[in-house]
Amino acid sequence: MNAFVRIHVEEQQQLSPSEKELLLKQQLSAFPSLIVALSGGADSAYLAWAAHGVMGERALSVTALSPSYSAHDRAVVEDFVRRLGVRHEFIETHEMENPKYRANAADRCYYCKDELFSVLDTMAQERGFGAIAYGVNADDTLDFRPGHRAAREHRVLAPLLDAGLHKPEIRLLSERAGLPTWDRPASACLSSR
């Protein structure tokens, strides 16, 4: 997988949402190809839409299916990709087979993301994708998110974070783009409920 140096610029906080969107699209255009981890939430859906718009068929959105992922979330993703014509695939992950995940400790999300990114790493290598990205935003850095550690370990990119995009800005830009996920509430996986 190609290494990519993330750009964090303090001036991004002075940019308008539209300027941050332009920065995001410029960053995405630098990739020869990209896999986007698409959960169906507002952030990952916006990232998938932006990557598809910039990269076309060079972008592939991928959703992991497992017992932790709800049928409702799957239906949301199916509708989203059908409506927007986003290139997409479902894959299976097996985090439930990991005793550390099943222990249900505070870092459970780490093991889920580690499984997801391991499967996506293999997919990227086998199919020649240059990078993997996920939909973490600038607000997510304020919370305890064990999945971020897995992303760092797997060198997964965070284009929304790199563009300085916050959740309200992503919702605004998603609404402007007509994305059906713009106002989708954040929800935990079935293992967290």
Segment roles from a protein language model:
Residues 166, 175-193:
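Histidine/lysine/aspartate-rich catalytic loop segments that bind and position anionic ligands
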